[in-house]
Amino acid sequence: MRTLLVFLLLAILVAVLIGNVQVEACKQGIDCKYPRGCIEGVCEPLYG
């Protein structure tokens, strides 16, 4: 039971890390969902 819990926690951690990498990766503004722009390879909200 303990092994299963550790495995599930590890799987969740890996999924979160993969999700963060996918969100941050952009080369141009069109790679980000509106209203966000690509700033230094990261999708950032555009204000103003």
UniProtKB/Swiss-Prot annotation:
Residues where Tyrosine amide is found: Y47
Keywords of the record: Amidation, Disulfide bond, Secreted, Signal
Principal subcellular localisation of the protein: secreted
Propeptide feature ranges: 22-24
Expression across tissues: Expressed in salivary glands. Highly expressed in the head, body and tail with a 2-3-fold higher expression in the head.
Source domain of life: Eukaryota
Gene Ontology, cellular component aspect: extracellular region
Compartments it resides in: Secreted
Record's signal peptide: 1-21
Disulfide bonds: C26-C38, C32-C43
Family: Belongs to the annelide toxin family.
Miscellaneous comment text of the record: Does not show effect on voltage-gated calcium channels, potassium channels, and tetrodotoxin-sensitive sodium channels. Does not show activity on Nav1.7/SCN9A, and shows very weak activity on cation channel TRPA1.
Function: Leech salivary gland peptide with unknown function.
Identification of the protein by name: Peptide HSTX-III
